């Protein structure tokens, strides 16, 4: 089942992430619903949140997990916030299926 955390948009998907920087390890902790009902993918990275290091680590980690080039992922919003929206280029059906598997859905 598709999650509101990832939505298809033509030739890409939008992924909502709640990032925990300095999280001890790089990991996907599943999909979680916020108090307002919006869902997001919980991701932690070991990088520190300074000078964009955590954002770069997030993009590199997700690219590796999805088997994509890092250039296929971009940050749309949330550069300095925990909640981020990413654009991931590729076949939306395939990307959503892979993300659901990674999130344990």
Question: PLM ranges: what are they?
Answer:
Residues 1-51, 56, 74-78, 85-105:
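Contiguous, often N-terminal, cationic amphipathic patches that form binding interfaces
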């Amino acid at each position: 089942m598709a999650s509101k955390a990832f939505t298809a948009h033509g030739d890409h998907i939008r992924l909502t992430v709640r990032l925990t920087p300095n999280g001890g390890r790089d990991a996907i902790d599943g999909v979680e619903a916020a108090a307002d009902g919006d869902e997001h993918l919980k991701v932690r990275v070991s990088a520190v949140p300074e000078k964009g290091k955590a954002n770069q680590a997030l993009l590199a980690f997700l690219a590796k997990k999805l088997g994509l080039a890092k250039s296929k992922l971009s940050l749309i919003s949330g550069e300095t916030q925990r909640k981020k929206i990413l654009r991931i280029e590729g076949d939306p059906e395939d990307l959503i299926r892979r993300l659901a598997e990674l999130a344990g859905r």
